[in-house]
Amino acid sequence: MKEIIKIFYTATFLFLITLTVEAESKVLTLGSSDAKVTVKVFSSLTCPHCATFHITVFDKMKKDYIDKGLVKFEHHAFPLDLAALNAEVIVRCASSEEKKFELLDEMYNQQRVWAVGSDINKINVSIKKIGSDLKLSEDNMNDCLKSNDAQDNILNQRIEAQKKYKIKSTPTIIVNEKEYTGKVNYEKFKKIIEKNL
């Protein structure tokens, strides 16, 4: 029975990502819209390399560039599975951009806790616990997880990214419309930003 449920969820997810949806995509942004440098990160919340990038690069970049108005940062949802999709839905349950980024931080920091196993119900309990710890209500999170619009917005981001940028892996990092691949530590990333300032 568990195998049938797993197959059902996987098939449903794959079907959904092939649909073109009408809902407007909401990209999470941080920083000045007038910044000279725009950093777009296409990532999946279940991707270990995405978590490493976020944990080792994002906070330093925020302090050194985003908070100073030099860089505009965009988090583009590119979920690779149903668990990542649901985690993105919970992130978008928050009312403010600041709270959304707090949730994003915690999803990456606690990835090894919640993004394990194949039981989507257990995964949902774990991601809702993260939301509860950051003061999201259980009812609000349940409503968000049931919302087709929330899922459609996220899946639309993935579809648009695939069409425009031909994303092959996560994280994909684009700085001022130039793609950077491979392992990116902060020192390497800092040089990329400085070159674009």
Q: Which residues make up each language-model segment?
A:
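Extracytoplasmic thiol/disulfide redox context detector
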Residues: 1-81, 132, 150-164, 194-197
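Cysteine-centric redox/oxidoreductase cores and disulfide-bonded domains
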Residues: 79-169, 174-197
